[in-house]
Amino acid sequence: MLTLKQISKHYNPGSVNELCLFRGFDFTIEEGEFVSVVGSNGSGKTSLLNIICGSIDVDGGCILVNGQDITGQKDYVRQRKIGRVYQDPAKGTCPSMTILENMSLADNKGRHYGLGKGVNKGRVSEYREILSQ
């Protein structure tokens, strides 16, 4: 389960360009739940994912994975618990590879980080159908 509790994030705090992105934001994804994050340009979708993955630090609140606080953990520690698959593989970490090939990295190169647990090759056609909708 992924839980965000009372997340707050401001860009350019204290300046005339200050932007409050999140204030007291709560969000929970139950184990096995499939979630889509949708919204207009600039609404915070990418920032939310970057906060979850640790690319952007939060100003307040905490991020829990299965009840364990991962807020502020180093990237290599957080990567053992959470990762992402890009909607458009051309913008992902290996743009020349298909989505399946990108996911297979978790089975191979990511195995020592514990990333392979989320990839089930037996469900490839199901993943493909979900992602094509």
What are these regions, as identified by a protein language model?
Residues S96-H112:
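Q-loop/switch helix immediately C-terminal to the Walker
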Residues V38-S40:
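The feature captures the beta-strand-to-loop junction immediately N-terminal to the Walker
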Residues G24-S36:
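Pre-Walker A (P-loop) beta-loop-beta motif of ABC nucleotide-binding domains
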Residues D69-G83, K91, Y113-K121:
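ABC ATPase NBD coupling module
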Residues G61-D69:
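Conserved ABC transporter NBD signature motif
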